[in-house]
C-alpha cells in the first residue's frame, strides 16, 4: 500500500518461486468454529488448504499489486524481486487430509478472490484506525 501511494516498486525478497499455503481468514474462522463445536478427537487437526492450492510467493505479490491497482487506480504497481536475498525453504506444506476426511465438501475461498476481499477491507479500514500503521 505504501509503495503504491509513494510510487515505489513493491520489492519482494528472493526469487518469488517458493510455494506457500494461504487460508482466507473467514474460511479459517468457519473451520475454527467447526472444530470447537464438532471435533472431539484428542489428536490435533490441521486447518489448511490442500497441497494442490500452494501458491508461489510471486503470485501473492502480483495478486496484491493487481488488487491495489484495481481499487486505487493510477500508475500500475511494479513488482520487483531482490534475488540477492535468500528464498528460504521451497515448500512448507501442511497436509489437510484429516480435515478433508471430516469436511470433504468444505469450499475454500479461491486465493485471488480472498486477496481482493482482503485488500478492499484493508483500504476501507486503513484511515479509520481499523488497521495498525
Predicted regions and their residues:
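C-terminal substrate-binding subdomain of Rossmann-fold SDR/epimerase-dehydratase oxidoreductases
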Residues: 2-133
